[in-house]
């Protein structure tokens, strides 16, 4: 089979799958029109609108339960107090769903409904993208925002097969189909947010979701992140927009989602300070006057991601009611026979759930285009498709399937242009499978994922994982998991290109084994221990050459997250410990910590909520990779230590109804630093002292 034939096959498959997805979405709209009741729907006496057959865990009201059904006990103003399924009941007014927004996740094997609470206070200030926090509030786990991007201080290995051009400056800010939100609500829901600072940093967010018809919602989110640079010729502007739609049929059998994600990133670049001593010893008090290596350089990137998915359950999810007219004869006065017409309800019950069932079929399509301009212009276009089947056909049912099986294929096609050279790879058959076996309360999950890259420069990838999960309670609030993973993956496409073009060097696949133990108790304790073994790790050195490790290395990692409270006093902390047996191949700090100590108060008869406290962050010194703006790459170095510095912030959060107000004095200890040494990368200082504020407001209208 020629490479052109493979590529053409992928395109034909994508077109055919696209037509199928379009047909399913059209069917969604037609089915919604047909199933929408025209009058009051009366549930027959003694008959439940949702199926309650089966055994096992009956906890459907706890959001953390795998059997959580947000509609399970919604009986306010209904004709009966019987448990309801995911059926749309017109006799229930919007007030039942007012104040409630149901958040969906884009998952290739299942769509689950969870409750999304109103925006609440966050002691890290992550909702306003503050100077030292990533989007999830842990600055050392991501890139940071208002400071210059840096590599992760806590690398995650063997999490899944990835196909990318190179490690990305903007990786911490990417919104993808699997991490954006899909909403289901009857009442329009809007979130507005604005943040700024004395240094002219600002961020804007506008989100809105609207119900089109029962089960069909549409939403959009726009964000603008525009931090001011910390010194000469630096700064950034990020625009982000997504528009999505999703549909649930009345019985949840047919589910579909589609959307578009657009990013535009720009970073004004200067390649760092010419002489760090000028900054450290305050030889130039005006930061704009400190000499830098470049003036006027910039990095720009534009991305466009189109995606869609649809799943259909071949098993009915609830009882079916059939109405018919029946003629009944009765004897009236004078023995006269009278014929009456009455309405009879036939109930076709849901068959007993069983692990052997028709299951759920699904399709997923995606097109991701990324164009980057630094010193050269690179671009990347990826077409993906996923076709799968699973016997997990009862996502809203409290019956637990003792044997869940998921299997499918992921054909893909990628075209990348690097330094004027075009690289293309494709595959028609990339199988994956997942088996989950219930063992009493616990479960054992086995996963396999393979990717064959039809390109002589890249070898096939594979990943195998086994996870043993044990919950200590029926609500699964306390649990323990043990897992082992073996992953074999080709290096990033740019590494492969540069190794061949510059060094005539063929790279080996990176082989990683990971052994992991994790314990979690509610939101109070989260302990995660990992032992990672890696062979053939690949990186750039300071000369821009590619180096492949000839010896294996071990990376031992441990993280402990604690959220403690005594009355109104709260202490949230995260401790990270790491040890790399080869710090040249895998440079990491030995210890990193983040601590938030604050008082959480409800004042004025609970009309005002306030949080007052401080953050402390620190990591030990290590040889952090340096950044090259010409290529957008990080390069390993062993000359300059970064870290061994405490960052301290003081903050105030206020919440009145659905409005949250945020005030923060960031990096307060910079005020009295006589010899500032707070670099986050070699030759790149971090943010100085600053005042930040913002407001977030949610509306149901």
Regions found by a protein language model. Name each.
Residues 9-16, 20-22, 43, 50, ...:
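Intrinsically disordered, low-complexity, compositionally biased regions/tails
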Residues 32-304, 314-327, 473-477, 684-688, ...:
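Membrane-proximal, glycine/serine-rich, low-complexity loop/turn segments characteristic
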Residues 185, 296-701:
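Exposed, low-structure sequence patches enriched in small/polar residues
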Residues 8, 72-75, 95, 335, ...:
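Polar/charged alpha-helical tracts
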Residues 1-40, 664, 689, 695-701:
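Bacterial Sec-dependent N-terminal signal peptides
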